[in-house]
Amino acid sequence: MCIRDRIVAGGWYFYTSSEIQVSDNLTLGDAIQPGIPKATLILAGNNKQSLTPTYPTPVKVNHSTTAIAQNGALIYPTTPNTNIDSILKQRSEVIENNTLTTEQGNEFRVTFEDGTTVHLNYNTELRYPVKFSQTKRMVYLKGEAYFKVAQDTRPFYVITDHGTIRQYGTEFNVNTFSPERTEVALVKGSISIIPTKSSQEQFIKPGQLAHIEQKNNNISIHNVDLTPYIAWNEGRLIFENRTLENIVEILEHWYNVDISFGTSELKQLRFTGNMDRYATISPILKAIA
């Protein structure tokens, strides 16, 4: 059977951009591959470079710095904060920003000059200086990213549309996909959160999930099992009592497919599951079909 641009499975309709020969709908799921490590690096002057697993290793990120692109990650050369020669040199340089962006069906990693690592999920934008200042480390995030912040005397700030997260050395996930709130899951260490339109500052502890609400600038903190919120960073797709509508939204972004429902009633069905994020979409179809 030849199906073009539509796959039907359990009342779901999957749209792809190519024609695929299949014997049944679940077999077609084997042809839909997961996301890949790919990103666009935007340099000063809006110059853009595409980063893929096959991209040449050296990447000139400004006039004096060359990063290394390898295995789906961009790695900046380390600059020890205690090196006096480096400090004096930095004071005479203009701080330049780089921006790393991922699209639907993509992910990427970056290691900053201080040793901090960030894993960008799909549809994410991260803006940061090539070298941090001597007093603070500050980045700007839209989308979702998992941070492992290197220990340093300088505070590390993540700026989002809804608020600012501050820490010194810790591990956490930030999700800004919802226009209504920013979600922060703290794995290790301690962080504080300040809403954009407020001076209110709240600290959260490991194992807590915080929501920064756009409507009223309130911060709500919950003690939860963080596993479903950080599973994507560890190569899993974990859903706990999630609606099919919510699951479909995640699958669309990661597998780069468009999905619609045979009936609106299907959207509110709830599922719990634990899947390999790097497998084809077929196991998920079989689990919920």
How would you describe each model-predicted region?
Residues 1-5:
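Conserved small/polar residues in nucleotide/adenosyl-binding loops
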Residues 9-289:
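A residue-level detector for the "anchor" residue at the start of short, highly conserved motifs
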